[in-house]
């Protein structure tokens, strides 16, 4: 049921269930990161960076410079700098880029959002070099709200429509259920069936059987309700920071 609901929302058929978000990061890093390889991010989260560096990889944080200016009213301070991304790929070589990870929104700089257009351009650039694209959707519900209210081309789109448009940009999407879904758990959605089967064993080794990945049935059922609520604009616009 959980996989079915996530497929309905994101349009990706293959789910690796985990007990929480950092377990997703562990599995992704185990599969992709090699010594001295590079992971490009708009901004890191503590565990996302730690899993990369633990395996001998490096993190390149390429959020736009203006994203770090505290006293500004820029609408999307989580945007990645596309010129820096291209320069990094050219310098490192595409084969040495483990993956591109975009975080929507950027937890450690105040949850600043990233625009749909920036995600689209960044993933297109990465894919032109054959680089896997990964979305950290843990804080996606807030980012969806900001895309709808701040991005002119999205004002007439529904939250489910925006979510699917964002999802269509990425090869993989992972999340912490405590944030996206309002419950305990996590998961990795993988678009490519071959890659999904290559990564299945990590769940069995580190999390549990593929049917639950360390979550109880109670937790999975609660997350299903949370996923539905995340698609409701009335619910995701209720944070105190959104009240004017």
Regions found by a protein language model. Give the residues of each.
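Conserved PLP-enzyme active-site core in the AAT-like
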Residues: 2-244
């Amino acid at each position: 049921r959980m996989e079915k609901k996530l497929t309905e929302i994101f349009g990706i058929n293959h789910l690796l269930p985990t007990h929480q978000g950092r377990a997703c990061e562990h599995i992704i890093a185990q599969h992709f990161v090699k010594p001295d390889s590079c992971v490009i991010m708009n901004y890191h989260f503590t565990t996302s960076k730690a899993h990369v560096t633990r395996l001998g990889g490096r993190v390149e944080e390429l959020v736009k410079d203006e994203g770090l200016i505290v006293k500004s009213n820029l609408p999307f301070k989580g945007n990645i700098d596309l010129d820096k991304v291209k320069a990094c790929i050219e310098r490192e070589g595409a084969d040495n880029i483990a993956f591109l990870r975009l975080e929507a929104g950027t937890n450690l700089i105040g949850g600043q959002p990233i625009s749909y257009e920036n995600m689209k351009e960044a993933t297109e650039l990465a894919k032109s070099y054959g680089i896997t694209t990964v979305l950290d959707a843990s804080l996606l519900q807030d980012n969806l709200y900001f895309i709808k209210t701040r991005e002119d081309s999205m004002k007439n789109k529904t939250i489910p429509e925006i979510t699917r448009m964002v999802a269509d940009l990425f090869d993989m999407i992972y999340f912490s259920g405590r944030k996206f879904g309002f419950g305990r758990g996590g998961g990795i959605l993988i678009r490519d069936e071959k890659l999904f089967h290559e990564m299945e064993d990590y769940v069995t080794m580190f999390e549990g059987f593929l049917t639950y990945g360390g979550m109880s049935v109670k937790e999975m059922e609660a997350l299903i309700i949370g996923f539905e609520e995340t698609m409701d604009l009335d619910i995701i616009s209720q944070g105190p920071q959104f009240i004017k």
